[in-house]
Amino acid sequence: MSATLLKQPLCTVVRQGKQSKVSGLNLLRLKAHLHRQHLSPSLIKLHSELKLDELQTDNTPDYVRLVLRSSVYDVINESPISQGVGLSSRLNTNVILKREDLLPVFSFKLRGAYNMIAKLDDSQRNQGVIACSAGNHAQGVAFAAKHLKIPATIVMPVCTPSIKYQNVSRLGSQVVLYGNDFDEAKAECAKLAEERGLTNIPPFDHPYVIAGQGTVAMEILRQVRTANKIGAVFVPVGGGGLIAGIGAYLKRVAPHIKIIGVETYDAATLHNSLQRNQRTPLPVVGTFADGTSVRMIGEETFRVAQQVVDEVVLVNTDEICAAVKDIFEDTRSIVEPSGALSVAGMKKYISTVHPEIDHTKNTYVPILSGANMNFDRLRFVSERAVLGEGKEVFMLVTLPDVPGAFKKMQKIIHPRSVTEFSYRYNEHRHESSSEVPKAYIYTSFSVVDREKEIKQVMQQLNALGFEAVDISDNELAKSHGRYLVGGASKVPNERIISFEFPERPGALTRFLGGLSDSWNLTLFHYRNHGADIGKVLAGISVPPRENLTFQKFLEDLGYTYHDETDNTVYQKFLKY
């Protein structure tokens, strides 16, 4: 036997109870066979687009090599890190912020887009590129194409806010507005790519895009002096390109670092898919953190995420708003909701998910993924931030509507600062009862120790015979109820429904057009959240015999909705 053969690695394979030795050459062939056997045809085709020296022995992408070979530094410098001084002090740990919000298009998306476009051959460059996006990916593709002098087309839904498509147009790309939603725009994008021979640049589900995003991990290890003390990196998750790239690199180079994904409760595509061990589409997806509002995680990104993600933390809107405020206080910069996801997840990981861990010995690195914040969202973020950080309480108080009752309630809340107080005399309630009339008060006030002070205030109110309910987590109260106090009415068979209306022409017309002539619209309150979605609360009087027809109307409408008829705020303030 030759020396060459002796040096080949051996692998033990069990077949039908018998063991056999497989040489190194045959091992490579076996791994390639297993790769084809266990992956979908679409993934095998995707991996085959890569060069041979960009693949591992099992024919899957070698992401460490792809990251090291990335072209992103032709167009950007490394994004800096910032010490989260305030966060570190409050959380009693070492927080270092990775500032992707400071890249040229204010988002990490430029990395993946540029890396893929830079690898196109001359014929592909001459034909041009196309992408479908109404957000950061669109700007990343446009910026990259302009830098490389490649024609680019960006397809966006018709309802895209003007500021977004104007930014893309300013970068030199042709903007095509098509369709009422992202799915229709995506279909048009695929059609144009086929007709014009354009190369489609996906937002996340391609090895070159993933590798471009993975350069973030390489920079973290270079920039953080005590990289050996990094306990976890917190990554916002939408389609999965960022977490796949960061995770694939870190788990090979610094496997001690945990990869923690962060999603919103209403867009938990990775969380749900990991639980079911397969990609799981979401029936509806929340849009507040619009940069991560994806119905289903990518196929390649999920394959990688299954191998590298240690945990996923879910957060809500209020927690995101509080994180935006935290970041502002540490950096004097305002990030978009998706950009604050990582900080919100880190805070929850420390305080709620893993309180048993000694976090004082760890360094945590949340990725601030972007800063494309719509200015008109700031009011909403500011309002909800205090709730997210537990510094404000919303309370519903029922007390006798007699002189002196309000004064007694205020004495209990004092010296806390009252931030809102709503009440209106309702003569109907007084006429309908022989008992002492009741007043329903909607109030909010500032607190330092939320749990302790809520308990204290409620006990003191109850001791006076007042009824108090904490409604800080009641979405109807926060979005609509506070603006409707005093408008109680007695409407037979009234149904109260909250909707998320798309901010586009015809949305209200479609809603009203579907109402039956026998249904009476009894309440309507709209509030814009500075996003592509507006929140609507509607009251509709529906005869009992038409309940099934009404339910079908709700389903066919296609808008996200919740039945709020039994909600405490409605029962106390809007109905008698």
Swiss-Prot record:
One of its GO terms (cellular component) is mitochondrion. Keywords: Allosteric enzyme, Amino-acid biosynthesis, Branched-chain amino acid biosynthesis, Isoleucine biosynthesis, Lyase, Mitochondrion, Pyridoxal phosphate, Repeat, Transit peptide. It is found in: Mitochondrion. Its main location: mitochondrion. Residues 393-473, 495-566 form the ACT-like domain. Homotetramer. This is Threonine dehydratase, mitochondrial. It comes from Saccharomyces cerevisiae (strain ATCC 204508 / S288c). The lineage of its organism: Eukaryota, Fungi, Dikarya, Ascomycota, Saccharomycotina.
